[in-house]
């Protein structure tokens, strides 16, 4: 089975289904499990590339739909591709843009050939086919591209989910035929909450020469416990020689569960979007900084956190003042804190797997969340929604 030159994945250690590995790309190695901050418009909101890298991130996600419409892939290519354009020196992944074309655009239609829609920016008529998705992602120049897929809404009837799987497979073959030889391509497994459909679709896509396999179509309205259960069964079923990517998920609790199921890669807007909504995340749950109880609170967000916000002496009282006053600084400080939490979670998970103690590590994280306000964290608006359904609307 063919693989893309300059791209590889090697498993380093395993503890149960959880595993560590190294994802090698033309822009450097990425240790897994890894979390990819979301840079929808070509930046992780409020932070510089150096600040993002300081959280431990070595791969970020860009949104094809938005970059296609503005500034346009031809301009990005002319200016050296996304890495040069954004000044991000490490690995980069772009999604296909299909979800946004269907969910954000006006007067959209799904046909065999792809999506036909009108831009939410200027109403221009656009057609997103597998070939166009590959052309746009090729011009953008990320290390990893995603196939165009069909993501059925939560609660869709089984025939609709089955057809989404079939069409996604057909589109996957067309994406493989159209992709640039230098760009890795991941297939996207659909199937809703049906384990049988998920496994069958994973086998179909696993027979094709994708460089990695992703789980799409989660966090679209299904109960969180159901998502955890399905991922726990389908994760270990995916080809172990390729990286496994859970798209658009999620809370720290979600990530702890999914890592235990053998998932290697994650993205979600939760840490950045929630920060801009005044929510700081900790192992014990969330802190809603505007609440009056923090008005005179001298303590940092988390005394165990090594992020610049917590080690820099910024008190909860000061952060609350900034947020209530509408100061931009607080958005940066909370975003740094939240992304550092995710970076810490990934580092500690990798160490626990390598040392054969992931089960105990997971119990400690989940127990701390249960003892705090984990339920509030899970119910936060946008907390477990996918990249496409949250950050892409901004």
Curated annotation (Swiss-Prot):
Record InterPro entries: ArchSynthase1/Queuine_TRR, TGT, TGT-like_sf, tRNA_ribo_trans-like
Annotated catalysed reactions: 7-aminomethyl-7-carbaguanine + guanosine(34) in tRNA = 7-aminomethyl-7-carbaguanosine(34) in tRNA + guanine
Chain residues that bind substrate: 95-99, 149, 190, 217
Pathway recorded for this protein: tRNA modification; tRNA-queuosine biosynthesis
Cystines in this chain: none
EC number of the protein: 2.4.2.29
Region RNA binding, annotated ranges: 248-254, 272-276
Binding, Zn(2+): 305, 307, 310, 337
Disordered: annotated span: 375-394
An example Gene Ontology molecular-function term: metal ion binding
Obligatory cofactor(s): Zn(2+)
Residue positions of the active site: 95 (proton acceptor), 267 (nucleophile)
Entry keywords, A to Z: Glycosyltransferase, Metal-binding, Queuosine biosynthesis, Transferase, tRNA processing, Zinc
One GO location term (cellular component): cytosol
Top enzyme category: transferase
Cofactor: how bound: Binds 1 zinc ion per subunit.
Domain of life: Bacteria
Record note on quaternary structure: Homodimer. Within each dimer, one monomer is responsible for RNA recognition and catalysis, while the other monomer binds to the replacement base PreQ1.
PANTHER family found in the cross-reference section: QUEUINE TRNA-RIBOSYLTRANSFERASE (PTHR46499:SF1)
NCBIfam families for this protein: Q_tRNA_tgt, tgt_general
Function of the protein: Catalyzes the base-exchange of a guanine (G) residue with the queuine precursor 7-aminomethyl-7-deazaguanine (PreQ1) at position 34 (anticodon wobble position) in tRNAs with GU(N) anticodons (tRNA-Asp, -Asn, -His and -Tyr). Catalysis occurs through a double-displacement mechanism. The nucleophile active site attacks the C1' of nucleotide 34 to detach the guanine base from the RNA, forming a covalent enzyme-RNA intermediate. The proton acceptor active site deprotonates the incoming PreQ1, allowing a nucleophilic attack on the C1' of the ribose to form the product.
Entry's family note: Belongs to the queuine tRNA-ribosyltransferase family.
Protein name, entry field: Queuine tRNA-ribosyltransferase
Organism whose genome encodes this protein: Sorangium cellulosum (strain So ce56)
């Amino acid at each position: 089975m063919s693989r893309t030159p300059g791209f590889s994945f090697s498993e380093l250690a395993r503890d149960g289904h959880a595993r560590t590995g190294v994802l090698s790309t033309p822009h450097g190695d990425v240790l897994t499990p890894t979390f990819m901050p979301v840079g929808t418009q070509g930046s992780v909101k409020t932070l510089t590339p150096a600040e993002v890298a300081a959280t431990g991130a070595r791969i970020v996600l860009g949104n094809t739909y938005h970059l296609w419409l503005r500034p346009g892939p031809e301009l990005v290519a002319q200016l050296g591709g996304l890495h040069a354009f954004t000044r991000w020196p490490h690995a980069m992944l772009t999604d296909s843009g299909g979800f946004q074309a269907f969910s954000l655009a006006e007067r959209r239609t799904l046909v065999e050939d792809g999506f036909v829609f009108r831009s939410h920016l200027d109403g221009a008529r656009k057609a997103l086919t597998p070939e166009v998705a590959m052309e746009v992602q090729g011009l953008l120049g990320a290390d990893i591209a995603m196939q165009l897929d069909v993501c059925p809404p939560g609660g869709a009837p089984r025939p609709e989910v089955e057809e989404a799987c079939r069409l996604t497979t057909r589109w996957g073959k067309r994406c493989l035929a159209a992709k640039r030889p230098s760009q890795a391509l991941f297939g996207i497994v659909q199937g809703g909450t049906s384990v049988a459909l998920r496994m069958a679709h994973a086998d179909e896509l696993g027979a094709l020469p994708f460089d990695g396999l992703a789980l799409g179509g989660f966090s679209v309205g299904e109960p969180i416990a159901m998502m955890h259960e399905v991922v726990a069964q389908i994760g270990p079923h995916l080809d172990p020689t390729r990286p496994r990517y859970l798209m658009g998920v999620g809370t720290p609790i979600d990530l702890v569960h999914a890592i235990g199921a053998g998932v290697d890669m994650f993205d979600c807007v939760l840490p950045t979007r929630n920060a801009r909504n005044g929510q700081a995340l900790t192992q014990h749950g969330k802190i809603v900084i505007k609440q009056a109880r923090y008005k005179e609170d001298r303590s940092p967000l988390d005394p165990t956190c090594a992020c610049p916000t917590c080690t820099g002496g910024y008190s909860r009282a000061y952060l609350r003042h900034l947020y209530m006053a509408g100061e931009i600084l607080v958005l940066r400080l909370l975003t740094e804190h939240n992304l550092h939490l995710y970076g810490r979670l990934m580092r500690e998970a990798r160490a626990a797997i390598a040392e054969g103690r992931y089960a105990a590590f997971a119990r400690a994280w989940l127990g701390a969340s249960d003892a705090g306000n984990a339920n509030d964290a899970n119910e936060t608006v946008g907390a477990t929604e996918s990249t496409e359904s949250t950050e892409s609307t901004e």
